[in-house]
Amino acid sequence: MAKYDDIINGIFFDRYEAGATSVRFERKDLAAKAHQLKIAVPKNLGDIIYSYKYRKSLPQEIIKTAPEGFYWRIKNVGIAQHEFVLTQGSEF
């Protein structure tokens, strides 16, 4: 699953600006980032999103950008459209 971390980190940091409270991306961006990183494109791109929503924490590099008392989560915002959203509270 390290490839998922590489892809999601790339997506986040390509778009993140210090102080941002949300970072939008589209599902097709996952495939583009995998190609750019020379990683085999996962057959089910949705599994990348699902993994970070329900199975595992986001990579530490992303977690560290959240201010104290906040965490990042991935939210669906449309058909094949997603957003990292800074949320107050605890991830678990």
What are these regions (language model features)?
Residues M1-I8, L37-K43, D47-E91:
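Charged low-complexity interaction tracts in eukaryotic proteins
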Residues M1-K28, K33-A34:
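Positively charged, polyanion-binding regions of nucleic-acid-associated proteins
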